[in-house]
Amino acid sequence: EQAMQGAADILRQSKKVIGIGSPRASIESNFALRELVGADNFYTGIAKGEQERLQMMLKVLREGGIHTPALRDIESYDAVLVLGEDITQTGARVALAVRQAVKGKAREMAAAQKVADWQIAAILNIGQRAKHPLFVTNVDNTRLDDIAAWTYRAPVEDQARLGFAIAHALDNNAPAVDGIDRDLQNKIDVIVQALAGAKKPLIISGTNAGSAEVIQAAANVAKALKGRGADVGITMIARSVNSMGLGMIGGGSLDDALTELETGRADAVVVLENDLHRHASAARVDAALAKAPLVLVVDHQRTAIMENAHLVLSAASFAESDGTVINNEGRAQRFFQVYDPSYYDSNTVMLESWRWLHSLHSTVQSREVDWTQLDHVIDAVVEKLPQLAGIKDAAPEASFRIRGQKLAREPHRYSGRTAMRANISVHEPRQPQDKDTMFAFSMEGNNQPSAPRSQIPFAW
């Protein structure tokens, strides 16, 4: 309460307050910051170049007219081209799905002989190392090289040129590339043949190569294949868990925010769950923050910028809070709280980032808090940002019940619950009450792990 009042007093006196959001914070938390500082003073906390690549990626997904498969669907593709992205490091689950896709050739051969999918020994015997083609381009070796039909190691610019050359070979209307040597041209012919001959080719790229041209080249290849009538898919991989969501919210880049602080136009800054040193040079970040009379940091882990902070609010991590993120497919995904930290330590003052920011906003405006549960924030997001209307359907509301019961987080066999706090007190306190979701922090409630729904809180 005292910290809120102190911060609110300084914010009221500041001539311009800016907010720096984060691609690892939820939609709700970024939105709460945007509401606190105003849409014009909200910055994404992403470097300018990265943000431009993110916007290009969103443009490709929105306007390209090319299907983006889910992780499970990636396994059904029969030719894969990975352009400039080391997916084993930036999208490990995608890399696993690509491995499965490559093995799909053996499964197809086995299916033709009426061998079931589960008979793995028979499939391996029939397949005899037969694989669907996988082509990988990167600046260095990757951990997918062992199953790739061909790998191309070259500077990022040359990888983009390769992509554009493949697109041109598939479709004459795509821009041509000059100066490609004969050996590389022969390889391009092989790739073109494999992609053109596939029923379901998949193109994978992303922002991690640090090149807008690579993303453009991947889009051109996918478009050229679509023009040939192929059932083509495109997968784009972003850098952080909610990069896509932040791109859809919009706002200035981190470079713009630092310029505001450096020139003195902004004299207070609120940084949300963002280690700014990861997105800009440490010297520039520290110099910019040193100029601001108020630096308020909200985070769940200790970062170097806290050395420059005047006030730090301890936020709940993803395991201790609820929220929504937008994944690389552009699909909204809700994450749910696993436990309440204050149950194990009553001295803990740890709130979700959006609760801290909304509480601060309410204190600044001297009004009552009107977001008391997650659904209220989601309704406010949908009202202000219609492009995010789909987040409401990512999971049922907090009022969802089955036969009047919430869904139990704990299975009936949750042994040792009474002993978990015995070192603190042998008297077991009441279980925490969850007002944000349809789950209960206990065994009490509906418990159907085999029910046909995705809201299952445990694997048993």
Residue ranges with predicted function:
Residues 20-30:
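Cofactor-cradling patches in redox/metallo enzymes
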Residues 36, 46-393, 456-460:
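Non-catalytic alpha/beta scaffold blocks inside enzyme catalytic domains
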Residues 216-219, 378-460:
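Long, low-complexity segments enriched in small/aliphatic residues
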Residues 1-12, 16-22:
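Catalytic P-loop NTP-binding/switch module of NTPases
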Residues 11, 26, 163-167:
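Short, Φ-rich (hydrophobic/aromatic) sequence segments
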